Amino acid sequence: MRSHSLSPGAHGDAEVLALLERRRTAGRGAGAHADDHRLALVVGGGGMRGAYAGGMVHALEAAGLAGCFDEVWGSSAGAFVGTALVLGHGADASRIFCDDMASREFIDPRRCGTRRPMVSLDHLLDHILVESKPTDWSSLVTSPVPLHVLVTRASDLSAHVLTGLPDGHAWKSAMRATAAIPLLAGPPVRIGDDDWIDGSVSDPLPVARALRGGATHVLALMTRTVDELVATPADARAPLWARSLDRLAPGLGRMAQDASRHGECLSLLTDAAHPDRAGAHLLTLAPHTSAGVRGLTTDPGRVAAASRIGHETVDGALGLPAAA
């Protein structure tokens, strides 16, 4: 790793990469780092755009860096990808989008307007993550690296964090909640005394939340290129599904459009003197180019390309040679 230079797709403070390198060299493993730093991995959401982040997490794991983080934060698809890093399933995170999720069983626009959601979380949680890419949610209970899952309270659209849950059932419910969008991906999920929906509605990239939680270093994985974020006008006309959500709950449709929500945190991501950073070291990795993947893309070729681009972006940041 080179602390003096950042590759395309990497933006911010190379000290984050330097800390990763020092911890890997020390070899102490997750939860046993001897320095005084607190290194958070923050993974953005975005539906099928999560393929970019899946490739990034696979690259981090392949480089021996998965155990270097003190905590992982994620919203929606980012929470699922973050889970893969915590549990050592980086390869699955890279392949699940093109192998399993780019399908009509998971996303089928023909279900729009029926009683069945266009996006089937049942298929994801009860088939894909059981049969194809098995995930033991109970392993999160004893993980030395805590997972923080963002959810949105349905009643007031406020962001909340679910972490330190007692068992696998609770974790599975949290994962359903962080991806649930009424009319699109299923009804709100009841946890405790509240109903919860997709975490990216209120906080698609919880960098500020990780900083407020005490992180001294943050590596944020983006699922849009910088150009895609900057090019999204704040007054862009909302798609039909988002306007339908606004009729269900005023403001829900606008908040569910992750491009506009990401745009609101660009100043935090790009301004080293931003008051919310409080001297912390922050590095973002965004796809170095676009594969043309959107939130509901089901073209396996494009989705596989997004995973490959994510892997290449991390390899470039780490100074590793491009894969043949």
Please name every model-derived segment.
Residues 1-73, 83-324:
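Patatin-like phospholipase
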Residues 74, 78:
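Gly/Ala-rich beta-loop-alpha elbow adjacent to hydrolase catalytic centers
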